[in-house]
């Protein structure tokens, strides 16, 4: 004959919970997540602000460890990567001769993606306050200006075709001179593009590879 009754407690029919509604740790985690939902981080790129909303932050959460949340690092990286970088992109340069030419090169703004992901993750896990806060990202390289042209109005222009060099300061031509760049026939060509000024030195003889 079958059992007429069963004691569900003794039969082990209930899952044993480790966290209960009066858990202080659970309450603290709930408060933290509510702060995230009501927070906004504004990434500042010059005059432009890129908002990171609490809703987006919450969508990155994959779990928790104690009162700290665990974030999906791939999603954090996807948000951060390449935002408003100018290094390596094509930009228009107005030459001293009055022409507009397109140039590229390593000079410009470039985010340190790994550094910013780590800093942003630490900031979020440390606990955000409610409301808005502005943030400057971690950069691997910076430029003179956030607006284009990002090299500003103080720079040196080298005209490889005309073999002439110009120096502009605050937008004014303050010096110019003829120059000799690398010998293309001997494969000593001077690379075209936009670069940072590495160093300045007088009376230096430049020699190519032997």
List each model region and its residues.
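Surface-exposed, secretory/extracytoplasmic low-complexity segments enriched in Ser/Thr/Asn/Gly/Pro
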Residues: 1-210
